[in-house]
Amino acid sequence: MIVGYRSTIITLSHPKLGNGKTISSNAIFQRSCRVRCSHSTTSSMNGFEDARDRIRESFGKLELSPSSYDTAWVAMVPSRHSLNEPCFPQCLDWIIENQREDGSWGLNPTHPLLLKDSLSSTLACLLALTKWRVGDEQIKRGLGFIETYGWAVDNKDQISPLGFEVIFSSMIKSAEKLDLNLPLNLHLVNLVKCKRDSTIKRNVEYMGEGVGELCDWKEMIKLHQRQNGSLFDSPATTAAALIYHQHDQKCYQYLNSIFQQHKNWVPTMYPTKVHSLLCLVDTLQNLGVHRHFKSEIKKALDEIYRLWQQKNEQIFSNVTHCAMAFRLLRMSYYDVSSDELAEFVDEEHFFATNGKYKSHVEILELHKASQLAIDHEKDDILDKINNWTRAFMEQKLLNNGFIDRMSKKEVELALRKFYTTSHLAENRRYIKSYEENNFKILKAAYRSPNINNKDLLAFSIHDFELCQAQHREELQQLKRWFEDYRLDQLGLAERYIHASYLFGVTVIPEPELSDARLMYAKYVMLLTIVDDHFESFASKDECFNIIELVERWDDYASVGYKSEKVKVFFSVFYKSIEELATIAEIKQGRSVKNHLINLWLELMKLMLMERVEWCSGKTIPSIEEYLYVTSITFCAKLIPLSTQYFLGIKISKDLLESDEICGLWNCSGRVMRILNDLQDSKREQKEVSINLVTLLMKSMSEEEAIMKIKEILEMNRRELLKMVLVQKKGSQLPQLCKDIFWRTSKWAHFTYSQTDGYRIAEEMKNHIDEVFYKPLNH
């Protein structure tokens, strides 16, 4: 039986394929389908190509937006020759030239939730101007902004920069020393100071500028200075080290190196190459347009992998970078060890060390990385990280600990586990939530122009719409095939057109593999018909008759038909397989028909054995026998192996019968079968059907059986992911051929991730609508 194919039926109306048709809901898309096809206007396609070229160029323009906050701190560094002169006067010029109309400084354009960021940046700029006695008019306007918006200092609805209470309170003290009278409510000032006192007891080296003279800067530099001369890659903290401890050549060299790239301002983090590359690759994948930039992404990840192998501090001194690099590299088939994440296994140790104030972003990225365990023993580090990060984020959600909606949404998605989500639906949601003015926040808010821009947004929208057009065209082709072969006379309703094509897009999203996708959908429908006949529609003698007809394929006429039902069935089945075998022969340059037929024959014989031997109670299979047989009858072997011939890759029969392929279909089949058994165990126990739960309950309790089955499931899921991601020495199997098996299991995980049938039906109805029909601007 096809995994989850008929467990829930939903109604979906569409003029293209008939109104009020019902379709099977249990299916999942593994990742996005993107297509380039002819467009109505040349100018539109030219714009599409131009945008793609500009996005490609962005791989070489890896920078962040200017940080008023950090630039102000650098501006406050005194000259090495005179304490009465600025070391970097160009920063003062930038501050004077970049005050906003309302008198503030900060991210431009700003955001309604960034008032604390604007207050922090504005106060830092006022300190710099006051210290060097310049910009009287700018100071006056800046104080006006603080007077108007000072109420936001303690507002819980505003997004706080990292260490805001510590740093802002410290800057208030600095203003007092400079005789800069701040128009702030005294009660608010005292509140901030109280929060500073409680926060400063923690490990706050990253916000050292907020500790000021109380910090042991000599010890700080000794412990935390990086090879590039910075403290935490933070221009502000490094500048503070020179303000309070003026004797470090490497700190000066670091700040000077920034001005080799930026004339008179600094970003909130530098260097930015690793950060920008990781975020750009991740964003392209989330938008579902990464296939357009394969060579650029490969080059970027090769560079990240080189730095990973060198244990470069740009990766390993930053929790977010380390976790993102591990995730992106492992999922892109690079050999990376989870040992590099060992220092994050303990929650208490994590929050007490590393010198840097922790944000939910770091914990979110650690959690994403922790889901990529592929070995029970070697990846126990990931299991430990997964346990505490999951508990931490669940508690945050429970306490409503996220101010902005996007952060909360990201966490909710991450907690669903990446292998139980639909990437195609997530691509759409990511595009809809994508904003060219999106920002992130450290000690100051910042943007990445090469990651958030109108080109990438327009490109992603256009690409998604082209993909939808191809989906609709292929659905029409499938409908014509359904009608030409009169599948309805075999009991297959037209509603299965959507459902079967959904499976095809799930497993084969690549737009150029249309033949493979349509073949997959046709196989799903044929398999449904076969399953119906061998399960209940046909008698035992009719099933034997069908098997004999398939065995004597080229001489089937000499066999004869037991009934008209068998004749109608075999006529449709024969024509369908002959058609698909012809296409496969053209693609492979040789006949593969016998192999395709033998795969069907094996499936049918085992289906009949289940019915005659197992369901009748004549034979009770062992656990291993049960898993082996049901993996095959669950289509884990037939469809993925047959699909290989349609992928545009020449592949030998020997390779398809290799131990590697056997391991892949066996693991994916076990995953699908176990997921099904866990969900259907209650129903099948009442029906006295054989499943893994009932087999294990002969020697243990139901609770123990379910626990044991979940262990087997997790072991096989990890083993499958390992076989797909880890490059086996001497393997001749193309990567795409292996990916098919993981995508199939991912679809099963999504199908069985919900136990509420109504919820599945509603979610899948929306899923089909959004993927195939609904415009992005809907």
UniProtKB/Swiss-Prot annotation:
Alphabetized SUPFAM superfamilies for the sequence: Terpenoid cyclases/Protein prenyltransferases, Terpenoid synthases
Superkingdom field: Eukaryota
A GO CC term assigned to this protein in UniProt: chloroplast
GO terms, biological process: gibberellin biosynthetic process
Motif (DDXXD motif): 531-535
InterPro entries hit by this protein: Isoprenoid_synthase_dom_sf (IPR008949), Terpene_synth_N (IPR001906), Terpene_synth_N_sf (IPR036965), Terpene_synthase-like (IPR050148), Terpene_synthase_metal-bd (IPR005630), Terpenoid_cyclase/PrenylTrfase (IPR008930)
Keywords on record: Chloroplast, Lyase, Magnesium, Metal-binding, Plastid, Transit peptide
Gene3D superfamilies assigned to the protein according to its UniProt record, in alphabetical order: 1.50.10.160, Farnesyl Diphosphate Synthase, Terpene synthase, N-terminal domain
Binding site for Mg(2+) 2: 531
EC number: 4.2.3.51
Transit peptide (residue range): 1-36
Catalytic activity: neryl diphosphate = beta-phellandrene + diphosphate
CC cofactor: Mg(2+)
Tissue spec: Trichomes.
Top class in the EC scheme: lyase
Location(s) in or outside the cell: Plastid, Chloroplast
GO terms for MF: magnesium ion binding; terpene synthase activity
Biological role: Monoterpene synthase catalyzing the production of beta-phellandrene from neryl diphosphate. Also produces lower amounts of delta-2-carene, alpha-phellandrene and limonene. When incubated in vitro with geranyl diphosphate, catalyzes the formation of acyclic myrcene and ocimene as major products in addition to beta-phellandrene.
Family: Belongs to the terpene synthase family. Tpse subfamily.
Domain notes: The Asp-Asp-Xaa-Xaa-Asp/Glu (DDXXD/E) motif is important for the catalytic activity, presumably through binding to Mg(2+).
Name of the protein described by the UniProt record: Beta-phellandrene synthase (neryl-diphosphate-cyclizing), chloroplastic
Gene name for this UniProt entry: PHS1
